[in-house]
Amino acid sequence: MFANIGWGEMLVLVIAGLVILGPERLPGAIRWTSGALRQARDYVSGATSQLRQDLGPEFDDLREPLQELQKLRGMTPRAAITKHLLDGDDSFLTGKFDDERPKQQPQTPAAQDKPEEKPDKPAGPVFDPDAT
């Protein structure tokens, strides 16, 4: 629950607690908060163990679809489509097909290397600032 709270944030919370509650009531508030969190954690673990006892081996069958959903949460839309609809073949989405292999150009001696000349026309489309 507090896995992504760093020491800096904890320090800000303690200072805010000192300002809001004062030094007299802060230790009691910390004890109450830690007790409430501990009790909530015990309730959750108790509910999990009770479900495990009630369902028996079916509990693991219930967890499998949840684990599959957890795997899907981390996927991007492109990865999900590639995995489930295209069987891992993303050439349809990337446009890189097997029969189009990059052709290797013959190597020329280094003495004949010339600096590339800039083309007269821009490489991209013409930009028209008046177009809407």
Curated annotation (Swiss-Prot):
InterPro entries: TatB. GO terms for cellular component: TAT protein transport complex. Its main location: membrane. Keywords: Cell membrane, Membrane, Protein transport, Translocation, Transmembrane, Transmembrane helix, Transport. Residues 91-132 are annotated as: Disordered. It is a single-pass membrane protein. It is found in: Cell membrane. The chain crosses the membrane at residues 2-22. GO terms for biological process: protein transport by the Tat complex. The keyword Cell wall biogenesis/degradation does not apply. One of its GO terms (molecular function) is protein transmembrane transporter activity. It comes from the Bacteria. Part of the twin-arginine translocation (Tat) system that transports large folded proteins containing a characteristic twin-arginine motif in their signal peptide across membranes. Together with TatC, TatB is part of a receptor directly interacting with Tat signal peptides. TatB may form an oligomeric binding site that transiently accommodates folded Tat precursor proteins before their translocation. Belongs to the TatB family. NCBIfam families: tatB. The Tat system comprises two distinct complexes: a TatABC complex, containing multiple copies of TatA, TatB and TatC subunits, and a separate TatA complex, containing only TatA subunits. Substrates initially bind to the TatABC complex, which probably triggers association of the separate TatA complex to form the active translocon. This is Sec-independent protein translocase protein TatB. The lineage of its organism: Bacteria, Bacillati, Actinomycetota, Actinomycetes, Mycobacteriales.
